[in-house]
């Protein structure tokens, strides 16, 4: 008898890998999904469901015409990045201190969650001499982003600010 354990992604129901084990009808299926799931978590996946482990121990059936197929479903982990925190660095653990933590993808290298816009007003007389001190104003903007740890894709949210207009200057 043969049992097939398929690991699929919720993103397009794509098969990530397949394991096959064989044995005799009535015997327990000697297999564990733990190591594969751990590896996928390191790559940035989350476990959605595990048909093989659900419901207890599995036994080879007596139907020789069909393989027993179990599906382990995984989703791509998307991690939010708060603009008020330091930006993540590529290839560093998402969860420091956890040995099996996935790592930030290279796409976070130039993550741009903060932006400033400045204006400078120069006060000068007609002859070009300084009339009074310059006025410099800066507006600060920030945005959240969501990083897909598997693909590296970054989804940026809208820019926000506490003040989006320069002060009136005379």
Residue ranges and their predicted role:
Residues 31-65, 84-85, 157-170:
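Surface-exposed interfaces of beta-sheet-rich extracellular modules
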Residues 11, 18-19, 23, 34-35, ...:
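N-terminal compositionally biased, intrinsically disordered segments and leader/signal-like regions
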Residues 24-32, 63-67, 114, 142-144:
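Solvent-exposed, conformationally flexible loop/turn segments
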């Amino acid at each position: 008898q043969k049992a097939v354990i398929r690991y699929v992604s919720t993103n397009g129901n794509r098969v990530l890998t397949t394991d096959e084990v064989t044995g005799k009808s009535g015997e327990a299926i000697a297999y564990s999904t733990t190591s594969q799931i751990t590896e996928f978590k390191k790559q940035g996946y989350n476990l959605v469901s595990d048909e093989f482990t659900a419901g207890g121990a599995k036994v080879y059936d007596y139907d020789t015409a069909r393989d027993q197929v179990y599906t382990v479903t995984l989703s791509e982990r998307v991690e939010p990045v708060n603009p008020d925190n330091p930006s993540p660095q590529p290839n560093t653990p998402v969860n420091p201190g956890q040995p099996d933590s996935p790592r930030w993808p290279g796409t976070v290298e130039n993550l741009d969650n903060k932006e400033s816009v400045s204006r400078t007003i120069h006060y000068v007389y007609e002859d070009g001499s300084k009339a009074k001190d310059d006025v410099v104003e800066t507006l600060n903007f920030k945005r959240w982003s969501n990083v897909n740890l598997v693909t590296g894709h970054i989804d940026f949210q809208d820019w926000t600010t506490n003040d989006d207009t320069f002060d009136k200057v005379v």
